[in-house]
Amino acid sequence: MSIEDIGSEQAYVSALYDRLDELRRRTTTRLRGVLRQHESLPRARFERDAASADCAATLARIRAAENGLCFGRLDFDDGERRYIGRLGIFDEAADYEPLLIDWRTPAARPFYAATGAVRLGVRRRRHIATRRRDVTGLEDDVFETGSRAPGAAPGSTPAELVGEPALFATLNAARTGRMSDIVATIQTEQDRIIRSDHRGVLVVQGGPGTGKTAVALHRAAYLLYTHRDRLARSGVLVVGPHQAFLRYIENVLPSLGETSVVSATVEVLYPGVTVRRAEEPAVAELKGRAGLADVIAAAVRDRQRLPVGQTFEIHTEERLLLLERSTCARARALARESGELHNDARAIFVRAVIDALARQVADGYAAETITAQVLEADPAAFDLLAPAGSGGTSLLDDDDLAQLRQELRADPAVQAALAELWPILSPDQLVAELYADPGTLAAAAPRLTAAERRLLHRPLAEDDPDPDDDWLRELRAATAPTAAGDTGAGVGAAGETAGADAPAPDGARPRPRPMGGWTAADIPLLDEAAELLGDDDQAARAAALRERVARVAYAQGVLDILSRDIEDDPEIMMATDLIDATRLADRHEDADLRTVAERALADRTWTFGHVVVDEAQELSEMAWRMVMRRCPTRSMTIVGDVAQTSDPAGTTSWERVLAPYPAVGAPARRETLTVNYRTPAEIMAVAADVLATLRPPQQPPRSVREVGERPWRLRVDAADLGAQVGQAVLAELARLAPGPVGSPTAGGSGGGRLAVLVPAGRIAELTAAVRAVVPTAESGPGAALTATVVVLGVREAKGLEFDTVLIADPDTLLTESARGAHDLYVALTRSTRTLGVLHTADVPPMLARLSPADAPRTRPAPPGDASAAAPGPTTDSDPAAGTAPASTSPTASSAPGT
């Protein structure tokens, strides 16, 4: 590209940045003016804070557009020219003529959709590369001509790939541990999915490296732009497989100017409970079955009990009450027929029982009074009296009966009886006690085998404290006795509105939990229980009560100060004559200014306007029930690959996932991503052999590039596996970047990252072996994004990618779980360039395409293919020493295949 072209584009880009700076100055000035406003009325404060939030969001979008503001240009046959970028910029002096078009608008679509076969009126598409605010390069796609880009695999043509030079430049950068946006290199099949209708469920099936995650995130940004009024209120939820994955993608949406999306794993969607341990695969599979929903429902009904005998004796301090089984049966039927959730329906049950007991006591009063009057007149008439309590005219009026019902409701013996027959339950209590009691399990789960029920059985935790019980300490602190004249009146009023059935603070107790704590597989069961019980709101009430106590106390202090100097003068009206502390506090109650994301994560019942589920094949049937509740409109984007399912409770069929959920608004539809941008063709050929063994059969994605390097295998002695892995790491790390091996600079910035993927049972052992030669090596998902060398289990690497991958002990990977072949397929496809496999037995037949380590690893570069491995030393490894061969080659970076 000529210097004149670059200079011309630089002038235009500089003008765009000048306009961006002006927008930033205007918004900053407006924000300062808003923040200087001092409003006293709640409504005015709310409007001020809303304006402030709007300015802050605008500034965030401006900051996000700073890097790569303008990345493309379209020249049309009719002479029209459009510049494409991260946000829209307009010329106010020219009737708001667009200077830069937001990539999400319909006007920008030809930038991604135009091909040599379907030009859409586009004559030339220009990709503009920038560094900070400087134009560094231009690449043109002229649709009348074109040639395959260097490094493209055979079969790729300009009609299939958009902007090949820009795309391959992106692919050939080293991985950084964070995913970046692909807004400048979105491909045609990806763009079609990103812009598809928001209504209904969209399933995107795509093999490794096809860009499922990138498509899902850019679709979220597109929908927020297109339907902002609706989605800004309800929010967009992105569900990922694990926290390391969420950290991996966390910069993508902010870089696109979107900061209001909620990103969470399934277990985070149930607030207040922390996962403490991993679940055994067999137990996780069992807990993930849809049939467990029936078990939870049966457990709830089992806690709505009737007396064992015909009567239930209640010994109060004053009398013996007899509660008949038939009375309880009528009360239970009435409560169940109401359709209310368990804890809400309890009020109906309690009311019916209390009414029956009150009538019994009233009849007893009447009988006692009549008996006393008759015997006083004629003692010989005792045998003629009807049995006490058999009925008669009540001597109590309505007010007396109301008072009697209140007394019965407050009586400890009556409360204990009601708690036994129809207790207030939290989801934690219901599920933990279900696990702990074999008899309850047998009654609730008759369709499970005895062996399956034993898998679910887990004793209750007794003494180990749980950090999640901080709410209990807050509740007790908030309701501790205060000095006379404090906030008793206001707090008392709040307490009365809770109803007599609400548990007293002194009766609150830590939430039951299984021994060892909850697992990720328990979370959907807790959510299911919450749907049937109603939320346990003790923690929320504790926080609200604590806040109210503080607010009323502060208001009382203000009134005391205002009245201090004039309280002895009866002729002067004081503030306390007009308002009390409670009303003053209520007038200054703050509006809820939390963001949509903050409110959504704190509210289990929140429903989202759109939900994106990534690595969706890993969700169990119970987890799907949980996710579907968050989006009753079924506006969802589901992305995954059923060939990569690792979770024992995951799915291998999208049809099976969606079958229980009727379509809402629009039928479910399916798209397939077919192009692999991450995995080189040499590695994908090996992975395709593994894919061929899986059921149901899947078509492997087509890789767009070759790297000129064959994936290798090395057989080692089982006893020497750790040492051989360490030597292989040293050899491969030396190829990533210069610097002393094991130093922070080895494989550092610009060099790329290396992962050793191992069986779950050998992580500790092989991590120690790698650290023996590379002290800076890390292990576990917490280090998966930051360490140059990291040792991971396959499931910890799901959704991530690395420049170099070494797989240790594939035989154990294949046998340690029921989905071992799926795990091996995932492991093989994490690499963007180099793959090595170290095995201790005969190589599995499905890995037969791997080249022996003592064979040359690079192939001659085809004529004109500059991206193939550069000439250089290709040292063969010594199988006895276990050293992998060394060669020089470039690495790869985040691109459309992430």
PLM regions and their residue ranges:
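Extended, charged low-complexity regulatory segments
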Residues: 1-192, 583, 859, 866-873, ...
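Conserved helicase motor core of SF1/SF2 NTP-dependent helicases
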Residues: 229, 234, 243, 247-287, ...
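ATP-hydrolysis module of ASCE/P-loop NTPase motor domains
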Residues: 279-368
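Conserved helicase NTPase catalytic core signature
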Residues: 327-610, 623
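Intrinsically disordered or highly flexible coil/loop and linker segments, enriched in small
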Residues: 22, 26-33, 144, 258, ...
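P-loop NTPase Walker
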Residues: 2-38, 42, 131, 150, ...
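Intrinsically disordered, low-complexity terminal tails and inter-domain linkers enriched
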Residues: 480-509, 738-750, 862-897
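Hydrophobic alpha-helical scaffolding
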Residues: 157, 172, 235, 239, ...
